[in-house]
Amino acid sequence: MKMLDFKVKRFVGIIFHLILAQICLAQTGIANQNFGKDTLQLREVVVRATRPLAKLNSEGFVTEVKGTVLEKLGFAKDVMGMLPGVLNNNGSIEVFGKGKPVFYINGHIVRNNIEVEQLKANQIDKITVITNPSSRYASTIGSIIKITTIKKVGDGFSFDNIATFGCRNYMYGKDNLDLNYRIDNLDVFGTLGFEKGKNTNSSKNVQNSWLSSHHQQNTTMKSTQHSKLIDGKWGFDFSSSPKLSFGAFYQVSYAPIKTNSSIMSSLYSDDVIESETSAYKDIKLRDLEHLLDGYCHGVWGKWNLEMTFDLMWKKTRENQNVIEQTGINQDFGIKDVGHARLMATELYASHPFLKGNFSFGVDFTNSSREENSESENSIMAGENNKIQELNLAYYVETMQHLGNVTFRIGGRYEHVNSEYFIGGRKNHEQSHVYDKFFPTASLSLLIGKTMVQLSYSKQCYRPLYSQLSNTVHYVNKYLYQSGNPYLQPSYSDNISLNLRYRWLALTANYKKVQNQIITSYTYYDDSKTIALLKKENSRNSLSNLQIMASFMPGFLWKCYYPVLACGVVSQFYKIDYRGNIKHVDNPLVVVKFNNIFKFHNNYMATVNYSWRSAGNSENIKMGSVGQINLSLAKDLSKKWNVKLSANDIFNTARKNTFTIFSGMNDVYIEKAASVRAVECIVRYKFNTVKTKYKGKGAGKKEMDRL
């Protein structure tokens, strides 16, 4: 670890030395013989960058990337961290107040994040952030990020490879190869991906129960994880004419993960120790997934027609062996096998209408998930359960332009038939039929130099299939985890306000949620010594207000581009805790301060800071966390690009803390996992062309649930 600290500090010093050297060169005018040309190019970029890069339209915030400093930033996820209302948390993209978005690239839905990770900034034309999706999208989708790439032409073979090497406690690496062959109107494409890594983490749990006496269970755990990912994708796209195109692809991925853990537990009753236990746990997890996606897009007169379909199969196998030592050794094993499948299709049509358009469509999804668990020498019983769902949705909407005013109004009707089987027999108490109408409406208007968008939507959150399973998972001697087949969907009413004025972007959202799904802490059996974590529907409604302001002044001093965003999430919620009403309404404050430095000789440096305060989310108290990341990138040629980065240089994001309050119990969880890492990314491309695949995909949210 000391050697890693030394390497990180040395790497940070090198980056700052290069930044300082480039600033000195820029200020003194000592560069190369082409300095005048570089200055002219830089001056042109400055002129374009001083214009607002983000504008607001009827969908959401649209940010121009082509021809701006953002196209030199590196990769798509680096660009997203600079967008208003978007957070980049160590590669995990979130829309503020909306959670993880659904990605679209050139109209087709992204099902593998490798595609987003491979996308380079200079391939992007624009990015649209939608915080209140229209009726066309499933009621469970809270936000969308749509990426439009620069249209490229040219036939022949293209090759694009990205290799990543890094150190985070241990060395890790991944490689992604993108191949494409284009001839006339036919595209044949394929991707291959491989990842391998090793990491360590630790956790500490303190469980408190206030019954006739005070019980406390203390648990510490250290784990080492080995992971791999092998991914392949092959497909084609054919455009017989400008009015007709179709295509399909097949994708397969295999992800084996092995985790070894050592656990120390102790039980206290009124501060008097009753027992101590040590345990060793080995988990082997293997995921195999197959996906077939296809689309057809056509124009018939003034009608725009689209059809998409998806077929997915997934198998998960988990073997868990535990050795507990409590004076005598107890060895037991748990085997869990899961099978999931999905069939989804969407039909969509739109037509010009009055001063806008009119559109309608139908979504159909049929999915199932079956889980079989076997327990050997354990008090946890084996389970066999199956969930089968049929989802049929109809939607219609219209968008009209009236001078400086644009309004969109629509509705979506969803019919869901959910059937729950235990041991092959249908359980009617846990089977449900839902029929619900979800309206959406938005109004956009220009007031002077200010663009304002006000929208309303009704949304739904359906439990993940794993949250509905009654299978019990072993965490440690005093803590188990399971799903809850009695969970109901939660529904929310959302009012959103987006505002854009010159260099200021403001996003605000208020929502009220009924049947909020929260984490509960109960007991596994009548002995009340083993806690059980599971999800349940809250009896109290939850209201939530989110506001974020982003300041983007453009270029300063011709080489510096800052983006400062400050946001607050405040919930209004109360729970029953230890016989009293507890208000969990401490706000969460989020700050991001991203900085781009552009220099001569194709150098680009970034210094990014992010921080989240302590506060409440649902019935959980979250601790504060923050980090600083540095990077330096250079285009060596038109084919080669190198990027060096140091993440979490002060190791401040290593620890995350949570406290869950539930009934007469609470549990404090402290997780420590290394985020700090040094990384080198090397990219080589040859005759790159972007695939013309236009499939939008169907049933994305249902796949996430599976």
Model-identified regions with their sequence ranges:
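Short, acidic, small-residue-rich periplasmic hinge/interaction motif at the N-terminus
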Residues: 28-69, 89-90, 98, 130-131
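N-terminal periplasmic accessory domains that precede
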Residues: 44, 76-79, 113-114, 129, ...
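Extracytoplasmic beta-strand/coil segments of soluble accessory domains associated
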Residues: 54, 77-109
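Short acidic/polar hinge/loop motifs at secondary-structure boundaries
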Residues: 82, 108-134
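Transmembrane beta-strands of outer-membrane beta-barrel pores
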Residues: 163-169, 183, 194-198, 252-256, ...
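Face-selective signature of the C-terminal outer-membrane beta-barrel domain
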Residues: 229-257, 280-423, 446, 450-451, ...
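Outer membrane beta-barrel strand-and-loop segments of large Gram-negative receptors
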Residues: 342-346, 393, 488, 505-565, ...
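Outer-membrane beta-barrel signature, preferentially recognizing the C-terminal barrel domain
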Residues: 386-389, 429-432, 460-514, 532-545, ...
